[in-house]
């Protein structure tokens, strides 16, 4: 669990997301409240439930990115799902309980990786021993006394020399034959939507088929070390303990990001099949959000303390179009701002992994130095903003399209520019994008 203060969380989010201070503050406080709740004594701790968040704002302004980065900071099980994928129980499609089942799968994988990292060092030593046993088989004991001891000392010295060479990577390309444990047979079962529970049960019946069997393989030492380290680490783990920790992690720290929640609102009051289905999904979501117990293959999972972050553009609907019970379960509402030209400029250069840095790094692999002048950045931001205004507003995602079109020729002919420097200024931007951005019909298809 993260022990960062809200200010530290916002500072970390600022490295990746431009603007949206209100949304960042809301999620930072929600995450800090997780830690605060853990410090409260029982039985009051059980009564403190997370305050779910509803983010309202157009596409491409950072709603999903804020939730994704937050989960990374919290090191928490996180799942992003589109509300439109789910249907009311009885209709063809996925039911909302599968959200928790998917989340617990993510948590088990995350917990297993964490536990394996803890024993990685010991597992690596054991894997090295197994490789050295193949490279240097133990000599058969011949005689007793001083001569046997001397032979043993020589063998140990040789073994240490080989271990040193193994760790330095000098033996990486040498091939050896090993008995490697076969993974359990995975079964892919195609089933109708809504029958995930049944397929899970069938899959678990066959999950142990083939496990424990060993296969003799010829592999390079570098690959053998990785395979054997994973095998030794897996032996050290207690599967039941991993499952228990994973369930606890979901119950206490899980984050569910419900995207496109505005698409399941009732847009008129005349009813109709579609409206019934949309309202049905909301009613199915309600117990999940307010706290229920879901049966999974890892045991019962309570959703009382899972944090739900919902988001939607709400162009054709309003938050008040959600059923009243669901509205009440999202007490914190945050409106995200549309992006300005200045925001676009900052997105291009100011974040830790900005688009400009990404393209500079990509072209540097072919010895092409890409430089962006300030006026070039400004012009690029202006064009992206103008195209958004004239056509469909897709927010910061427009920058991907614009910069790809801008660098199309340079990327294509990068091999011919090796050792050269390419400067992107406003003149270069206008030459590459000017005609396309001015012609509304053309920009609708190209940008």
Swiss-Prot record:
Its main location: cytoplasm. GO terms for cellular component: HslUV protease complex. Pfam families: AAA, AAA_2. It is found in: Cytoplasm. Keywords: ATP-binding, Chaperone, Cytoplasm, Nucleotide-binding, Stress response. ATP binds at residues 18, 60-65, 259, 325, 397. It comes from the Bacteria. The keyword Transit peptide does not apply. The keyword Chaperone applies. One of its GO terms (molecular function) is ATP hydrolysis activity. One of its GO terms (biological process) is protein unfolding. InterPro entries: AAA+_ATPase, ATP-dep_Clp_protease_ClpX, ATPase_AAA_core, Clp_ATPase_C, HslU, P-loop_NTPase. HAMAP family: HslU (MF_00249). A double ring-shaped homohexamer of HslV is capped on each side by a ring-shaped HslU homohexamer. The assembly of the HslU/HslV complex is dependent on binding of ATP. PANTHER family: ATP-DEPENDENT CLP PROTEASE ATP-BINDING SUBUNIT CLPX-LIKE, MITOCHONDRIAL-RELATED, ATP-DEPENDENT PROTEASE ATPASE SUBUNIT HSLU. Belongs to the ClpX chaperone family. HslU subfamily. This is ATP-dependent protease ATPase subunit HslU. The lineage of its organism: Bacteria, Pseudomonadati, Pseudomonadota, Betaproteobacteria, Burkholderiales.
